[in-house]
A protein has these predicted regions:
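Active-site mouth loops of central-metabolism enzymes
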Residues: 13-25, 46, 97-104, 147-151
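His/Asp/Glu-enriched, well-ordered alpha-helical/loop segment
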Residues: 191-200, 219-288
Length: 288
């Protein structure tokens, strides 16, 4: 594929670096490594943590963005578009590799404490919509222009529909860390697969989602609502490009470029891959 570069809206880390830091230089290094792999823009994704820890991570990303704005972006690699918060308003039943002890009840006070002074850089937040108080937080985020993804959730279809009505616009790594699809209770996954308005994150490494599942998504979900993400993390990856934490899938070791190659192998057309990895993520953030 002859393209300018990919856009990754969900990356926790790459190589030896990740967002669990208070050092903006590490965030800039992440951006440089991503750029070498063909990614031109990223949304550093902060793990769920205690609010004071997440705020340190937010500050590091904010400072890295400031450094990019003051200098030639090419020096600092992939452009940092803002930040993606994966938590802390998540359901411990669907924690995946996240630290469930950091999950908290969604309240407007907790939201304000988390993002105060950083509202302008928070672009996406993942919330489990079935939690008490979640709908009010979703409504507030939507009013602020923050995209709300449903994820790390045990929500039923009815609860997911209510969240969409409240302002949720996307789904974090569909089928992963959520109630499994069932023929009598489709849950968030079922809504994401069939609804033409909701964007869905797709980890296309062939492990988080079976190749047949990837084909299903590309064949039945409106293409303009599919967003390829890496969900990349730092650390040693397996030969298949995934990272495990105590036997649980903890993230991908791939970049978007690597995911694109996996999609090509299962017959997804280049034009579809380009739309899902460049056009759609930018549109989701309102960037033309």
């Amino acid at each position: 594929m002859n393209i300018h570069g990919f856009v990754d809206l969900h990356t926790h880390g790459i190589g030896k670096y990740d967002t669990r830091t208070d050092d903006y230089e590490e965030i800039l290094t992440m951006a440089r490594v991503h750029a070498k792999a063909g990614t031109i823009a990223i949304l550093p994704t902060i793990y769920s943590g205690h609010i004071n820890e997440m705020r340190k991570n937010l500050k590091a990303v904010s400072m890295a963005m400031d450094m990019q704005e003051k200098a030639d972006n090419r020096k600092f690699g992939a452009q940092i578009l803002g930040v993606n918060l994966e938590g802390p308003f998540l359901n411990p039943v669907r924690c995946g590799a996240m630290d469930r002890d950091t999950f908290i009840k969604p309240t407007l006070a907790a939201l304000n404490k988390l993002i105060a002074d950083y509202e302008d850089i928070v672009r996406i937040i993942t919330i489990a919509p079935e939690l008490p108080g979640a709908l009010k937080v979703i409504e507030k985020c939507a009013d602020m222009g923050i995209r709300v993804n449903m994820g790390h959730s045990d929500a039923t279809l009815k609860q997911a529909v209510e969240a969409k009505k409240a302002g949720a616009t996307g789904i974090t790594h569909i089928f992963n860390a959520m109630r499994p699809f069932h023929h009598r209770e489709p849950g968030i996954a079922g809504l994401g697969l069939t609804n033409s308005d909701l964007y869905i994150e797709v980890i296309a490494d062939g492990i988080h989602l079976h190749p047949l599942t990837l084909e299903l998504l590309f064949n039945h979900k409106p293409l303009d609502k599919i967003i390829i993400v890496s969900d990349s993390v730092r650390g040693q990856k397996t030969a298949k490009g995934v990272v495990y934490d105590k036997g649980v899938l903890a993230g991908s070791g791939l970049t978007i470029s690597g995911a694109a190659k996996r999609l090509q192998l299962i017959g997804i057309r280049d034009a579809e891959i380009i739309e899902a990895s460049i056009d759609n993520p930018l549109r989701y953030l309102g960037i033309k």
